[in-house]
């Protein structure tokens, strides 16, 4: 398939620049893969489409204030964007840097009160590896000196409101540089309604990386290579998902990040495996889903890996038809936009 097969016209004014006043106030489009029909609804009523016994798998990653503004030891201004923590006991991160002259290994960075960095060897362009020095807890230091990294299509500076609204209500594990945005619609009240209906809600963690915004640069989508992201599947989640599959109950993934993690961590026998690792799975049409029966997701960019993923689940023509309808109905797109449920 060609990249152009996943293109569509999107008016700029439909790209949501701010969240709605209430999380659950978004609109919802429901796609039935069997009947090839779609319905328009309100997200607040999403529980109506769940059944007792369904398992909803959520990504509990927490967005960190990954944008750091500081200066090099020579005095020049530098912006450091944390992308992914590297394995090890020290806080060494793959980072993107923006400055007049790219820093070399050994360059010291002053990044705010109580936080310094040193550029170390390693890192394939455009990334630099930076080892951070600080007192206390790294995540708390970041909360004090870092800035929330809004996506590039949100054309404004982050505000204090984004610190809470660009997080899900179930965010627990710090490490993402972008939110798992399908989860932004959920409130504690909606989660309680789902539980009362008999829906199991199980967490996993995938720390969303900057690559989620990177465009595909190959016309043949099979040549695209996904970025790596750190993930963790708890024992309890693996057990709950495997029981559901054994019983013929549905597993519904909240977001493309949960989908990719579930389908990456499954073994040859179709059993979800608990544990940690790095995920670089690219799901495209022709992929055989072994865990995921349904998906809650936002409306994605044209020609993006995320749009390709939802097309793999629901069918390319059906998805593009749905997106055309969403544009006509003036649905809001991308991170702070409206929502889709694929069943």
Swiss-Prot record:
Question: Among the entry's GO cellular component annotations, what is one?
Answer: cytoplasm
Taken from the record, one Pfam family name reads: Queuosine_synth
Report the principal subcellular site: cytoplasm
Pathway per the UniProt entry: tRNA modification; tRNA-queuosine biosynthesis
Q: Does the keyword Zinc-finger apply?
A: no
A Gene Ontology annotation in the biological process aspect, one of them, is: tRNA wobble guanine modification
Q: Work out whether the entry's keyword set contains Transcription.
A: no
Q: Give one GO molecular function term.
A: S-adenosylmethionine:tRNA ribosyltransferase-isomerase activity
Tell me the domain of life.
Answer: Bacteria
EC numbers on record: 2.4.99.17
List the catalytic activities from the record: 7-aminomethyl-7-carbaguanosine(34) in tRNA + S-adenosyl-L-methionine = epoxyqueuosine(34) in tRNA + adenine + L-methionine + 2 H(+)
Enzyme class, first EC level, given as a word? transferase
InterPro entries found in the cross-reference section? QueA, QueA_dom1, QueA_dom2, QueA_sf
Q: Where does the record say this protein resides?
A: Cytoplasm
Keywords attached to this entry = Cytoplasm, Queuosine biosynthesis, S-adenosyl-L-methionine, Transferase
Question: Which family does the record claim for this protein?
Answer: Belongs to the QueA family.
Functional summary from the UniProt entry: Transfers and isomerizes the ribose moiety from AdoMet to the 7-aminomethyl group of 7-deazaguanine (preQ1-tRNA) to give epoxyqueuosine (oQ-tRNA).
Known PANTHER family for this protein?
Answer: S-ADENOSYLMETHIONINE:TRNA RIBOSYLTRANSFERASE-ISOMERASE
Give the record's subunit note: Monomer.
Protein name as annotated: S-adenosylmethionine:tRNA ribosyltransferase-isomerase
Its lineage opens with: Bacteria, Pseudomonadati, Thermodesulfobacteriota, Desulfuromonadia, Desulfuromonadales
């Amino acid at each position: 398939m060609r990249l152009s097969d996943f293109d569509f016209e999107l008016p700029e004014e439909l790209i949501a620049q701010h969240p709605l006043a209430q999380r659950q106030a978004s609109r919802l489009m429901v796609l039935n893969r069997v009947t090839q029909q779609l319905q328009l609804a309100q997200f607040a009523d999403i529980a109506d489409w769940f059944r007792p016994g369904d398992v909803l798998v959520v990504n509990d990653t927490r967005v960190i204030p990954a944008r750091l503004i500081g200066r090099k030891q020579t005095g020049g201004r530098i912006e450091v964007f944390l992308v992914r923590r590297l394995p090890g006991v020290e806080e060494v991160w793959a980072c993107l840097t923006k400055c007049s002259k790219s820093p070399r290994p050994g360059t010291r960075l002053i990044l705010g009160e109580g936080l310094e960095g040193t550029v170390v060897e390693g890192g394939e362009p455009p990334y630099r590896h930076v080892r951070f020095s600080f007192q206390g807890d790294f995540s708390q230091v970041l909360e004090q000196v870092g800035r929330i990294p809004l996506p590039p299509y949100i054309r404004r500076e982050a505000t204090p409101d984004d610190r809470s609204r660009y997080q899900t209500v179930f965010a627990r594990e710090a490490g993402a540089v972008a939110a798992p945005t399908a989860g932004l619609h959920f409130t504690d009240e909606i989660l309680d309604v789902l539980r009362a209906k008999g829906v199991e809600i199980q967490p996993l963690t995938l720390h969303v990386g900057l690559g989620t915004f990177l465009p595909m640069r190959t016309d043949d989508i099979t040549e695209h290579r996904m970025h790596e992201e750190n993930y963790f599947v708890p024992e309890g989640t693996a057990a709950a998902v495997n029981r559901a599959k054994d019983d013929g109950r549905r597993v519904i993934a909240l977001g493309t990040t949960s989908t990719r993690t579930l389908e990456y961590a499954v073994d040859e026998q179709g059993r979800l495996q608990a544990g940690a690792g790095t995920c670089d799975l690219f799901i495209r049409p022709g992929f055989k889903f072994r865990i995921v029966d349904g998906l809650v997701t936002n409306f994605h960019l044209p020609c993006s890996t995320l749009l390709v993923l939802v097309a793999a689940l629901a069918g390319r023509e059906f998805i593009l038809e749905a997106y055309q309808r969403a544009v006509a109905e003036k649905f809001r797109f991308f991170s702070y936009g409206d929502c889709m449920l694929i069943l």
